[in-house]
Swiss-Prot record:
Keyword check for Transmembrane: no
Stated role: Component of the dark-operative protochlorophyllide reductase (DPOR) that uses Mg-ATP and reduced ferredoxin to reduce ring D of protochlorophyllide (Pchlide) to form chlorophyllide a (Chlide). This reaction is light-independent. The NB-protein (ChlN-ChlB) is the catalytic component of the complex.
MF terms in GO: 4 iron, 4 sulfur cluster binding; ATP binding; metal ion binding; oxidoreductase activity, acting on iron-sulfur proteins as donors; oxidoreductase activity, acting on the CH-CH group of donors, iron-sulfur protein as acceptor
Involved pathway(s): Porphyrin-containing compound metabolism; chlorophyll biosynthesis (light-independent)
InterPro entries: LIPOR_BchN/ChlN, Nase/OxRdtase_comp1, Protochl_reductN
UniProt-recorded name of the protein: Light-independent protochlorophyllide reductase subunit N
Amino acid sequence: MTAAVDTSNTLHFQCETGNYHTFCPISCVAWLYPKIEDSFFLVIGTKTCGYFLQNAMGVMIFAEPRYAMAELEEGDISAKLNDYEELKRLCLQIQRDRNPSVIVWIGTCTTEIIKMDLEGLAQKLEAEIGIPIVVARANGLDYAFTQGEDTVLASMAQRCPEQVQEEERETRGGLQALFYGLRSGKKKEEEGFHPHPPLVIFGSVPDPVVTQLTLELKKYGIRVSGWLPAKRYGELPAIEPGTHVVGVNPFLSRTATTLVRRKKAKLIPAPFPIGPDGTRAWIEAIARELGIPTPGLAEREAEVWRHPQVQEYLGLLRGKSVFFMGDNLLEVSLARFLVRCGMTVQEIGIPYLDKRYQAAELALLERTCEEMGVPKPTLVEKPDNYHQLQRIKALQPDLVITGMAHANPLEARGITTKWSVEFTFAPIHGFGNTQALLELVTRPLRRNAALKGLGWEQLVREEASV
């Protein structure tokens, strides 16, 4: 085993057989239930799943969140109870108390092991109670916790209509229609857009990011027909054969496959809009596929890089090295962004890598390394944590981006760390969130500098006198 950084002209791929130290994918409920405002998520699992949700999402005593646990007991596992009747009772209670537009069943490891036919039960129950029931098997058998969102969106993609009636199209717009009336002035609305096939963007991001990316595309005359997921289940985008689709997150390969194979959509191969360079490449890929020019886009990116606050953050990163242990499948995009910021990426550990879906991102990473004159990193799929720790000890990186399980042990050994899970929940997409992304990356470096100024950079062991 060598600790040297790969300096070859191409990206070097390795595959180890390490364990997956990551959150359970059912944690996707944390950011999906606020995103889909009229939904209710029912996690079907054991007490362990319930404890995890309580710890990961907080115990909401005074609020009634739109998710719940259907706890499997011994009678369920031994097939002594009628699963259909139990789930029917719970769904009727949810319908009575919360009246959602859609109920999402989240399968877990236990439902997989006991071979619970959730799809068959959902189809029968949906017809009986009259509420759409979407089944997503977001269990711990996946590689990374972010793939829970991928499973949910892949299931929802199959519910997208092929066409929307003109009357329904006019009323779409959610709550705005209640306050401002139906849409009017269709000709005026069409002004400023180039004629092109429908474009649907998939991936769950905060509403301000949805607005930012939609407006960025609008500047070049590109109309976004819809987002998956939509804010309301009834506003799922229409996806007909030939609709162009593009993702905003690198962990949505299953959703992309479903859209292409089941809905006959056309996937736009694009990097992901993380950082100014990624956002520019994302817009360029969409515009190139649709045959639309993007004047001034390069200057738009340069303007973001020239911002004084961004320059201050870049000064902290230039010349430093970073090591990714692998956690949430955002590693390749973040590595590409940090190379553009002037850092050297020593290794990219990643739980799972879909080379087809991330082909454009990998190509951009390779091109960025060449332009910045830094060695191309080694990508290690399913990394073995023991070997990773040996490589970290040999390479001594300035920053390690890792899961929470390894952060404190590494800090105790004098290695500066950053929790990778923070990048999952923070708004990091688009031009407008560049400062927020850099603030996240530089926080441990700024913290260490502040502690060093106070003379607290070393841990001192003292004998306790009891």
